[in-house]
Amino acid sequence: MTRAVRIHQLKIAPKYFNAVVAGQKTAELRKDDRGYKVGDVLSLCEWKHGVFTGREWAAVISHVLPVNDVMAVSEQWVMLSIRPLTPLEALGYVIAGGAV
């Protein structure tokens, strides 16, 4: 049985947001407080000076690396490998239940 695609809405600073949109940023370091899984979608919402700019972009998680696997840290962090999706691709991905 397949699981439903989870969508995680996250705040992101403009310089990182722009790098994701341009395809230059393909990983995201995050505290693992949401149980991120391969196939989940990140809804990246650009925030500047504490205010949502209205810009949003999606990316699908292609790999989850627990940071504790490579270094000892006191909290649970993960390095998420991501593949940016256009808004239309993101919609199709979610509707298809994560099928590529």
UniProtKB/Swiss-Prot annotation:
Gene3D superfamilies: Hypothetical protein. This is Protein ORFd in retron Ec67. The keyword Transmembrane does not apply. SUPFAM superfamilies: PUA domain-like. To phage P2 uncharacterized 12.9 kDa protein in gpA 3'region. InterPro entries: DUF3850 (IPR039440), PUA-like_sf (IPR015947). Keywords: Transposable element. It comes from the Bacteria.
